[in-house]
Every structure is written in C-alpha cells, then in structure tokens.
Amino acid sequence: MPYGNSKEIETDFDSITISLASPEDILERSYGEVMKPETINYRSFKPEMGGLFCEKIFGPVKDYECHCGKYKRIRYKGIICDRCGVEVTRKAVRRERMGHISLSVPVVHIWYFKTLPNKIGHLLGLKSKDLEKVIYYENYIVIQPGTAERLGVEENQLLTEEEYYEILYQIRDDNNRLQDDNEEKFIAKIGGEAVETMLERLELDKLAQELRYQVRTETSQQRKSKALKRLDVVEAFREANEDGTNKPEWMVMRVIPVIPPELRPLVPLDGGRFATSDLNDLYRRVIIRNNRLKRLIDIKAPEVILRNEKRMLQEAVDSLFDNSRKSNSVRGSSNRPLKSLSDMLKGKQGRFRQNLLGKRVDYSGRSVIVSGPHLELHQCGLPKEMAVELFKPFIIRRLIERGIVKTVKSAKKYVDKKTEDVWDILEKVIQGRPVLLNRAPTLHRLGIQAFQPVLTENKAIEIHPLVCPAYNADFDGDQMAVHVPLSHEACLESMVLMLSSHNVRSPADGGPLAVPSQDMILGLYYITKAKSNQKGEGMRFANVQEVRQAFDQDQVALHAKIQLRDPDGSGEMIDTTVGRVIFNETLPDTLDYVNEVLSTKNVRPVIARVLKQTGFEETADFLDAIKDMGFRRSTTSGMTFSLSDIIIPDEKEELIEEANETVEEAEQNYSMGFITDNERYNQVIDVWTKTNNKVSEVLFDALKEHKEGFNPIFTMADSGARGSQEQIRQLGGMRGLMAKPQKNIGEGGGGGEILENPILSNFKEGLTVQEYFISTHGSRKGLADTALKTADAGYLTRRLVDVSQSVTVTEHDCGTLRGINVGALKDNEEVVAPLSDRITGRVSVRDVYDPHTDELIVEANELITDEIADDIAQTSIEEIEIRSVLTCEAERGVCTLCYGQNLATGRMVEVGESVGVVAAQSIGEPGTQLTLRTFHTGGTATREVGESTIQAKFAGTLEFENLRTVTYEDTDGPKEVVLSRQGEVRIMDTDGDRRELTSYVVPYGAELLVDEGEDVEDGDVLASWDPYNSLILTEANGTVRFEDIIEDTTYREETDEQTGHKEKVIVESRERTLTPAVIVETEDGEQREYNMPVDARIQVDEGDEVQAGQTLAKMPRQAAQTSDITGGLPRVEELFEARTPDEPAVVSEIDGIVSFGDQKRGSQEVIVTSRDGDMEKSYMVSLSKHMLVHEGDYVEAGDRLCDGQIAPHDILSIKGPRAVQEHLLNEVQEVYRLQGVDIDDKHFEVVIRQMMKRVKITEPGDTNFLEEDQVDRQKMASINDDLYDKFVVKDPSDANVEIGEVIGRRRLRELNSELKREDKPEIEVREARPAVGEPLLLGITKASLATDSMISAASFQETTKVLTNSAIRSRTDPLEGLKENVVAGHSIPAGTGQREYRDLVVGSKSELEELQAAIGGDGESPSGDGAAGDGAPSEEDVEQIEASGSEN
C-alpha cells in the first residue's frame, strides 16, 4: 500500500488550501492500518499491537526504544526492530503519525448530507429525507432503469426491498451478467455504495449547463431558487475539479483516517483506572463494527443481517465525525454525548479558539496589584520573587559567564538559594528590559502596556495610579499578569510602541486617557479654589517667584485671592490665587497660565494642551508632577466625609407640600372625568420629576454656600473626585421615583413603568420600611443587569473584532475622488456635535475657500488640524466634504488619506496600522462600561419630561412652509389648530440677506400662537400641544356619524372605577373586515372619514355637531419610559446586525401625493402617486398602526407613512448606500452620546464599510457568477474589468472555439484572419456583458462569516458549515487578515509584521558602502522599498551582512 512516507510540515507557507481528501491521500498520510479495537494491555500497560495505540503504526512510547526492548538508545535511530516491527525514533512522532481503517463498505461523510445546504442532495437532486433513507439502508435507489423502464421504473426512484426483488423477478434473467455500462442493465443499489456510484456517474459540466438554462428560463421563483442552490454546489465542484483536487465521490469514504494517539490520549489515574478521550470510544465502535461486518461478509451471512450491520457501521462513522448532529447521539458512561471530531473544533473550548487563537505562554506570572504613587509613569513595581523566576534563564547565563557555576543544573540550584550575587545579577539583567502588564478583561489595546520594572520587596505588583483608567483597574483585589518580551525586536517594540508614557491618548477619541482621578483631582481642586478673607488677600506680585517666597514664609494663605503680573509678558495684572500659581509651576513653559478651578472637566483640556504643544516625554513628567501634587494636597487638606457635611435644605418640605397639592389636583381632575387615567399618571410622574430636580438644585445651592464652598461632600462631587449629583441628592435631598418591578427584565430594552409614589426621605433621614422595600427592587435589577449585560457587551466586541480584523492601512492614497459631506450634528436645532469636532483629523477632498474672503483655508488631500477646523468653523461654511473609509477605494484595507489622523498619536496614520481592530475595540470597550453604569444610582428612575412647546431659539421674522391651520373656538376662545403633518415654521434673519436661522416642525394638532411674518424674540413660545396624547382632529364642520364602531366588537366602554366616567376605547376586532371610523358629514353633503386605530379614545358621540379643528379622538402616547443603556446596548446590536426592527415603519419609495385606497384584511391601502402621475406605488399599512400621513399630503422618498422605526434595508433600497451609512452612523453614535461616551466617527465608519463590502448579483452577464450570489464588491469590479474588450462566441464557424466561449479582441482577429485565408465565414460574436450587482447591507455576524478567509470564518462561528463549504470549493486562504495568521502561527501582517518588511536586509551604512565598493558599484543605495537597485548586494554578501548583524 502506498502509505507511510512521512511529510515534514513546512512552517514557511503563504496560503492554506482545504479540500476533500481522496482515499489515496488518506492512505499516503497513514503509517498503517488499525485492525483491533484494543488500546493497551491491561497487565503490561503497553499498547496492543495493531490496536488504537499500536507502536508499530504510530511510533514508540519511549524515546528511542522499541516495543520489545531489543533496541534502546539513540544510536539505533531509524532502525526498524526485526522482532516487533517498531521504528526506533523520538516519541514525539506519536503526535504526528496517522493511521487508517479500511471500511468493508463505503460510508457517506455526515458533514455532506446533514449540514445545510445538503451537498450530496443538491448534486443528485434528491430530498434530504430520501437521501437518508438510502444511506441508512431503508430503501434501494434506481441508478439506471435499463430494461425495467417498461415497468414504469424511473431513474432516482426509491424502492422498498419487496419492490426491488419484484422488479428483479420480472426483468431478464441475465441482468447480473451484463456489464455496468450496458444501457440494458437495471441497476439499483442501497447505502453508501449507491451514493458513491451515483456521484461517480455525475457529469458536472452537463448538469451545470442544464441548471443554468433552467435558471434563465424558469418562471416559478421557487423552482428557480432551488436550481440556483443546486447550481451553487455543482459550480463549487467544477471550479475545484479543474485540477482534479475534488471529486464528488470523495464525499463517500472507503478509508477513514485515525488521528495520532497523543491527540486522544489514555491517561492513567491513581487507583489503577484510566481516563480516556471520547474519540477512542468512537474509534473502537467503528473498528468493532467494521471487523464484525468483514467476518459476516466472509461467512456469507444473510442480506438482512448484513444490511443491519452496514447501517450500524454508517452510524458509528457518523458519530465519530459529528456526534452532535445525530438525534440519537452516542452517550458515555455518565450519559453525556461523547465529543466527536467536529466538537473538538467548535466553540470556545474548541481547537480554534482555545489553542490556535489564544495560547498560554512561558515567561509570565500574575499577582495582586497595589498602588505605587512613588513610581514614574513608565515604571511598575515588580516583586523580587517574581522577577527571579521570570528572568531565571538570563540569570543562569550570567552566572555561567562569570564562572560562579559550571553547569545549568548547578546554576538552577544556586539561583534557588537566592544569594547576594543573584540579586546583583538580577538588577543588571532587568536594566533596559521592559515587561508587559496585562489586566483581564483586555477590552482595548491599552489593556496591555509596557513598563520598566522596579524591584520591590513585597509580593504585589505596584501600578502607577495614572494608568488605572486605561486598565480600568482598582486596588480592591484586582490581579494582573506580567509577560517578558524576549527577543531584541520584542523589547524594542515594547519600549517604542507600548511604553505606558507613550500611550497617554485614547485611540477612541484622541483625548488624554491618563487623567488624574479621585484623590489627585481632589487635591488639585482644593489647591486651585479661591476663598475670601484669607491672609494676604489682595496682595500684588510681579512674578511667580515672589508668590512662592511669600507663601513659603507664611505671608499669604494658599486660597488667598491675589494679583499677579501675567507671565506671558504682556504686563497685565491677572486675578488669581496662590494655589493656582503653585499649580502653574508644574506646567511646561510653553503653555499659557491656567487660571481656573481644576475639576476633572478642566484638567482634561489642560493635559490635552500639554500633549499637543510638547510631546509624550514632557507630558509624562507633567502628569507625574500633578499626581504628586494632587496626592500631597488632598492629604494635607484633611478633607473627610462626615455625616454633618450632609445638609438637608429647609425648602425641601415646602417643595414636597406643593407637589402633593399638584398631585391632588390631578387626582381630582381625573375623578371628575376631565382627564384619563393615563394622563393623570403622566402628570403625576412629571410633577415628581420636576420636584426632585428642584430639591436637588436647592440642595446643591446650600452645599455650595456651606463652608464657603469647601464642604467636603460638595467638593468631592464638584471636582469629579467621587460621587455624583445624583448620589448626593439621595443623601441629602430625596431618593425620588423608583422603577416598577416587572417580570420581563432585559426584554426589548426599555426600563419600563415608574412607580408614581416617590421615596420622599433621603439616606440621612433614613427610609421607612416600605420605602426601603420599594428601593431594593431597583438596586437588585442593577446588579442582575450588570451580570447579564457584561456577557452581551463582550460578545458584541468579539463580533466587531471579527468583522473588521482584516482592515489595515495598506497604502498612502487610493486616489479616490469621492468623499462624504459632514456638517454639525443637530438634535432639534441644538448642536450635538459641532462641525469642527467632526472634521478634525480628517482629510479634505477638495480645496476649501472662505466664502467671504476667497482665501484658501485647506488644500485638497490635506489633513484638517484643530486650527484649520476652527478656521472653517469661523466662516459660514455649513458642511464640508471629507475623505472617508466609506468611500475609500483601496483593494485591501484602507488608505492613509481616507482614514486621516491616528487618534492615539495625533499624527497621520501610518501604513500597516491595524485600524479595524482599533475600531472594534473603541466601540466595544465602552459597551462593557455602559452596561456597568446602571446600578450605581441604586435603580432610581429618571425620565425626560415630555416636550410640549416650541420656543424660539433666535430673534427674527417668521415664515411658514406647508402649514395648514384652522381656527377652532372652544370655551377658552378661538385658537389656531395645526392640521398639517410636515408643516414647518422658519425663523429668518431680519437683516438684509434673509437667511434661515432655524426651522421647527410643528406637530399635528398643536395650537399655533403666532402669525406668519410676525417678529419674535428669543424665548417666545411659537406653539404648544398636549405632550401625553396624539390627537385625531376633524378638518371640516359637520355632523358625526360612526361606522363599524360596534360595542364589544371594535370598541369596549371603559368605566373608571373611581370616577364613573365612561370612554369608548377602540380594540382590535376579530373580524378583519370591520374598520372603525368616525365620519364627519358637512352641510354640502361631503363625507370626511377618519380611521380609528387601536387604543384610540373617542371624544365625540354619534350625532354631535363638530367644528373644524375639534378633537375626535385621543391616543395616549406611550407611558413614560426610563432611559437606561439597558435599552442602549440591544439598540447598538440591532443596528450593527442590520436587523429589521420589530414593528418597522412602512416607507414611501417615491416622492408623491398620498391617497387612500380600500381596506383589506385589517390593513389600509395607501397609494403614493408621483406629481407627474407617471408612477404609482401602493402600500398596505396595518390598521393597528398610527398613520402619519393624510389624504393629499406630499411625501418624499424615504418618508414614513405610519409610526415605527425605519428598517435599514429600506433606506438602502430607497435612498441608496450613502443614506444608510449615515443612518447607521448617527443612530449608533446617538446611543453612545446619551451615555456621554465620545467615540470618533471613523471607528464606526470602518465597521460600516465592512458591513457594506459585498454586492448581490442581479445580472450575472457573461461572468461565472450566479444570480443571487453575494460577492465582494472589489472582486466583481476586477472580474468585470477583465471582461472589458472581450467577446462571446455566437457561431464558431470552423474555428477551434466553443459557443459561449469568451475570447479577447486579439485572439478573435487572429482566428478570423485564419478563417479568411481558408475562405470560411468569420466567427459571429457579441460583446461580453459585465455582471450587475446591487449593494448589500450585511449584519456583522453575516459579514464575518462571508469573509474571503475560511480560517477566520471557521474560528468565528458555525465551524463545520464553513469548513464543509470551503472543502467542496477547495478554497485557498491567502492569509491576509490578522486572525488567519495568528492561527497559522505567523506574525500578523500589520505594523512591523507587514509583508513588505519581510525580505528587507538590515545592516549598517558602513557595511553597505563596503559592499558597494567591493561590487564596484557607483555608490547609489538600493531603492527604498526593498527592491534591488543598481548596486544591489549579491546573495553571499547578504548572508555576510546578516551574520555580522547577528554578532552585533
């Protein structure tokens, strides 16, 4: 047999291909056949010969020792023992040598008929159920009807055993003697053999042609999609089969491989028992059944017994390959399913994620961390005990060098004695050797940083306080891991790239991350705060030295207000305090004098300025200085937290009284029937929310005044050291409203209802038992949420990393001319993110000029710095076009100019930066933070008070657009009621240029309080409305008539128990034909119909006279929700996964006028007709939804017709890719912004780019794509480019080409001229048609699985599915992303591991000059990109350089 030739595994490869293994392949890799199911001998504990652990097949158990012991020691290496047949070699070969089992009958591989899509089923055109009947020996299948065709037998028909024998009985007797290729012969088989024969007989090319024809001509969508699915599998095999690497019949196996025994070990436990890997059990079952089947075949057992045994063999092999796919999986002794080969790959504990993507490493240790305030920013304290252990090999080398010991063994003993010499050597060894510190969970790249170790006597690692925010570390028992970089390159990278003092900026938003907090901030705040009537107040000083002198001599107090000549040399006097002067001594000289109280908010910009104007080195010194000052001053200030510092304001009682009265009033209105229960509830909640806010204002005012603003609790909160306004409110104000306990925590997000009686006490007064009980619920919800949501955030991060891991910066400029327009982000006219913030650090697409002076502000392809951004913001420019990764046209990854500035360094991003992973980490890291935010405030509910007015933000003149109003008179007099949906009020500048200052959309049903053309002042109220109810108004005067409003069918009468007031509330009716409506009949006989949605409360009775503008029905808006990131994280996930929302809005696809059609099955038809009447689209909107449009309204494409969220796929199909990108970006940013988290847009853009990378083929043209294929946009473009200037043969004439073949212009000319010479007609051709695709939006999970790298996809999710699909395609992974390379054990192709740097030769300049002189070159250096120039060194020279380099 052709097996046993050992293959050494190459480590230096640049791609990995996965394909089906042929039986020959399996035999070639095998070292022998496993014949017996035995494992080891129970007496000698040695492997049984020919068994699953056989030494003859897999190699010796002990190094260089054969089974019988005839040959021992290394000198017999390579000899095969003549007694036991074992090769004398290393025992490590037992980890790499494979065996095999030859099966008596072919067995079908479970992956290819149990995973979806069913590969074998698609190829043969069989249903999965039918296929399984054949495979598991229930039915015969007809492979060739032959003479049985006259009996009505067809190909692929299933036959029971009786039918099979019946047919054999009826056809010719010599059927069995005929050859298989004789068309007369009737062939029907069963089991794996049948499937194998059918796969062998397949003609893939012919099948592909038939299927392509069917796809082109098929009218039924269902049949067409079925044909496409089949075609997909057929094409996969055809592509892979061009070089004979994949044959369909290899999905049926005649030999199965046995993996090396060390990978499925038998481990002796104490007590004489053995623990074994599940695989051994599974293999044993296969071998036992296979041997039994062999024996049965040999003794010619009856067919029934054989068939049963064959089926059992098939099942045994199935279990071995994938036990979890089987319904009746094989279970072990403890009744758990055994882990099969597939399970070894899958999931977190599988091969990919456990051993390939993450490994445990040598030279590492972990210990508890403590604060090290005496350290410098780039240092960490390392316990001596740990250091000795970590640097042991280095110490041993030094000991031997110094001649203290002779051998490594004695050196080890010497080190363990821990003598003086050892400590001396250790001090020397760690000089210039950084260590890496890591804290789990490592949520972003700052979770691992490099430090210079300082040896300490304790057993805990000491951490600099300023790196805590980056690690999110505290000292309540956190542990950290230490790693030692070994090679010179690793040390260099650690020092240059990873040193903590070089990582002060956050990669997420570019702001400083090493910001003092807690004690340090308290000290800085204390030292820079002013106090009246202090010693030396009002003194004037000429310079800083004088102030220092006076303070040191106790002439002036720390908080005294003094005057100082401005150090900038302008000679002006500035009002400041002594403390601020002392703080400014720590600032670098280049910075302006900082004259403000330093709270967390104010310190951050100061650090940012220092960073910008100096650099990392000086910033680190500055940070160390303010750290020391902060700690010292907070200690000497004597700030403490005491009960007497909590003040309860006197006004609290009054405010609560007032609130109680208002609530009482609402209750009365309700009992009189003026308002609904819902309105009452909303009013009560609002009252308490407002009261709570007032109490906390009063409380803070009192604290501010107390001790002249030096109240410790106020100081701690105001400086941002500890505690929040919210927490102090609960200490001294009132705890406020609580969330209502609800069953469905975490479902659908929202925080749910709020209890309407608040907790009036605070923690200083103490809570009553009832109040305490109510408040426990919120606190527990917080803790439960934390636990559940952390996992979600972690999973989100994992998916983000997976989708964007392969995005690196691959070139400087991709040369695109496109960009995206960005302006300031506004929310109801309030600027959320100004223009300058959104364009800083990006690159402009074209030159930008000042519109007034026409001077150039920024050139095309130039980086917009802070200064340029401010210049642009000063002008009247509203938006500017910038380069973006969304429009970047780089083949792989993105280019420098489209990405812009690297936020972590403040410089342009370098080629090789792995921006994808940074983006994923920047988005995922706060996700975890956000989830942990809920419980600090103990679950107290906060809610926004609903908006109910429009106030003018500017003074100006009013203009109306699309605003329809009607005058309506009620008991309070006449009022203007708005009847339009999209009506706008604009405030125009009163000056000459009449530009629009701002515009407001006025909601339907609002009362308009101003007239067109009126002048308004800032703060005037323009309109007001009911914030608790949506209204339905009548637009004409007339009489009310009800239609389909039937008691207990379409409405129920709700009687309020307390008030006796009755209301008609519309309910969803069982009968779909009924559509409740209120009809208003006008005097001239016109009828206006108003549909009543579910939950509408009708305000009029049948026969009432109504006037235009009167309310017909109210719909309560949703009860107030608490806003909490619990809703936020699922929202982020929903957007990134591009999910359709639960209740999506129906969206208009065209601009046009709305009209209503019929009502069918509980839905209203809405028709949109374009203005020119050419196009008409009709939509069905469920009647339970609230309509946002009315008859005659004008809508634009993308406008909603009813309420609900717009599905991103709708935006893509209606408004195009740019709009959906903007939608996703803004929606996700909004969630983070609500939580006060700053993340730069470019990070979201990187992820959105990956979501939109693929297109769906709508017209395959003359390419090999199939309709509905999802392919990479770049791939489609390059294949279409290849088709340019090519032709498709329609009639080949006599040339050697096929119909439908694609040929180039040149070949066509040559063939035609040949035909001309022979006087034959020319070839008839047509131009080749390119493929057409439409952009696709994929969720991040789908996008990750759709990558070109199968290794990355397989290690992400759905491992078996990815591997089966790749195997039949014989896919090659080019190892371009980061993940694939980690799996393959290569350095990643980013940063210093880029492929371009692989072949560079490193040497000194002098060596290069010597070389050139030797070669006789002209002294020119080789060109920079590693390509050989004129004077390029030869290979021998290169080797010399490398040798000398390594000596240095």
From Swiss-Prot:
Protein name: DNA-directed RNA polymerase subunit beta'
Family: Belongs to the RNA polymerase beta' chain family.
Intrachain S-S bonds: none
GO molecular function, one term: magnesium ion binding
Spans annotated as Disordered: 1408-1448
PANTHER family the UniProt entry points to: DNA-DIRECTED RNA POLYMERASE, DNA-DIRECTED RNA POLYMERASE SUBUNIT BETA
Lineage: Bacteria, Pseudomonadati, Rhodothermota, Rhodothermia, Rhodothermales
Cofactor note: Binds 1 Mg(2+) ion per subunit.
Binding residue positions for Mg(2+): 474, 476, 478
Quaternary structure and interacting proteins, as annotated: The RNAP catalytic core consists of 2 alpha, 1 beta, 1 beta' and 1 omega subunit. When a sigma factor is associated with the core the holoenzyme is formed, which can initiate transcription.
Gene3D superfamilies: 1.10.132.30, 1.10.150.390, 1.10.1790.20, 1.10.40.90, 2.40.40.20, 2.40.50.100, 3.30.60.280, RNA polymerase II, clamp domain
Keyword Protein biosynthesis belongs to the record: no
Gene Ontology cellular component annotations, sorted alphabetically: DNA-directed RNA polymerase complex
Keyword Zinc: yes
Cited NCBIfam families: rpoC_TIGR
Catalytic EC class: transferase
Record function comment: DNA-dependent RNA polymerase catalyzes the transcription of DNA into RNA using the four ribonucleoside triphosphates as substrates.
Biological processes per GO annotation: DNA-templated transcription
EC assignment: 2.7.7.6
Reaction catalysis annotation: RNA(n) + a ribonucleoside 5'-triphosphate = RNA(n+1) + diphosphate
Residues bound to Zn(2+) 2: 814, 888, 895, 898
UniProtKB keywords: DNA-directed RNA polymerase, Magnesium, Metal-binding, Nucleotidyltransferase, Transcription, Transferase, Zinc
Cofactor: Mg(2+); Zn(2+)
SUPFAM superfamilies assigned: beta and beta-prime subunits of DNA dependent RNA-polymerase, Rudiment single hybrid motif
Binding sites annotated in the UniProt record for Zn(2+) 1: 66, 68, 81, 84
